[in-house]
């Protein structure tokens, strides 16, 4: 009788994958599980509207290294060898069911800009044969033989859990080292992931969900990795596609990724080499050759290596822009879907009109790089955080700094506005950082104290604001023609007139208003990496995988809705004219 030999071990180096060895034999691999704790009365957040109580602490399991990775024993802290880029735990949240209440303080659809690439017929979406049925990726990730994916673990009762779940509950997607988890935060077993993907070596650094295409049967997720590869993932069908495979378009880690607002197919990825790339999830990749010559001087605020108006749109990328030689750490789309705020490791904040492919303004930090950025719900203000331990508020209509926010003792990793606590006069935002603290801030232009030294230069600054506002309101009819400038137009310092107009000098501290936090709380023992505000809660995640949720005080959220019940949504777009700027200046 012929007997087949046993299959070879799945892991070629079991000792490296196992926790250790006993008597020379490898210890069997034990899959670690998520753990949830519900502290009683622990870590409350005391704010004016009430107390935020900690609901639970979900600790994600850190996966062991892949067997192909040699274990690092006694690493040298002084070694100069570059280490692979990593990211703390970050969340992407989505609510499939209808929301009870939307934030009243939001941008009206009537002021939204046209879709990105709307004027290029080469980007027109082809007709869908199946009507409203969404296209899904082609490859089954569970049965994948790709060396990029190590394995996929799905919950044994995932189908039943999806059918029985509360439609108003939140889905969460979280990265931790080489693992990517799909969680149902509305479930009683929220610590049990619906699916967990283990990649071979790559770490997912950023991910995002397409709010336009989400439904009970379809969710589009994109995630960018430390290897530069991008995964388009549809969790319900467990299908996936690999984009920028082996760095064919851009061979650099993806530091941040977002779906382009209003688009079903396009998403934008920031790479560590200073490039912003727009991809189409349904296009094939091709080796990228710049359509415009690459300038190595680094003095241009934006080099368009491929324009969204290009007729060559058969393959990715759709557009590719070079901002700097430094790493892009994060970017954020404005609520009016026209502008883009980008922060870089070189300490600059760059505000773009990404529809016109031009940079409007460049601001600088006091020192060190900028790490995070976000827009206010009405698009009037931009908030950044960075390596100078400061949170900074910038006025977009006035093109200037408004205030520095002091309170952190280490780098600021994430800033976010709370749309349920914002109105026409007061803004609420939060920040977290490597000091393990969560800070909340209330900001109103009228409450800021202008230093006396600042008042002396009001006239000069007003003229600068007017000049910059007029410049920002101009749109070039032919971006390609205006982008080409002769050497005769350049000034003695190497920058042309356009560069000088958008580069703002650093405002001295003596002339900058300071804003203290309304709450500062140390919420853990490891750095905090992410912050999010929900209708009924505040959520954070940390470097070691702690996802904490605080319930809002009922009286606070109810008072907010009652105060706004008779008001209408904002109809004025960001930077819509001098009226916005004049009102802001009058409040100061």
Curated annotation (Swiss-Prot):
GO cellular-component term (any): cell division site
Q: Where are the WD repeats?
A: 249-289, 323-364, 365-404, 407-451, 523-560
Q: Which UniProt keywords apply?
A: Repeat, Transcription, Transcription regulation, Ubl conjugation pathway, WD repeat
Name the residue ranges with Polar residues bias: 455-471
Task: Identify the domain of life.
Answer: Eukaryota
InterPro entries linked to this entry: WD40/YVTN_repeat-like_dom_sf, WD40_repeat_dom_sf, WD40_rpt, WD_repeat_creC_regulators
Keyword check for Transcription, yes or no.
yes
Q: Name one GO biological process term.
A: carbon catabolite repression of transcription
Which SMART domains does this entry report, sorted A to Z? WD40
Q: Where is this region: Disordered?
A: 452-499, 569-588
Give the range the annotation lists for the signal sequence: none
Pfam families in the cross-refs: WD40 (PF00400)
Say if the entry is tagged with keyword Repeat. yes
Please give the subunit comment from the record: Interacts with creB.
Similarity section: Belongs to the WD repeat creC family.
Briefly state the protein's biological role.
Component of the regulatory network controlling carbon source utilization through ubiquitination and deubiquitination involving creA, creB, creC, creD and acrB. Required to prevent the proteolysis of the CreB deubiquitinating enzyme in the absence of carbon catabolite repression. CreB deubiquitinating enzyme stabilized in a complex with the CreC leads to the expression of genes such as those in the proline and quinate pathways.
Kindly provide the name given to this protein in its UniProt entry: Probable catabolite repression protein creC
Q: Which species?
A: Aspergillus terreus (strain NIH 2624 / FGSC A1156)
Q: What is the lineage of its organism?
A: Eukaryota, Fungi, Dikarya, Ascomycota, Pezizomycotina
What gene name does this entry carry? creC
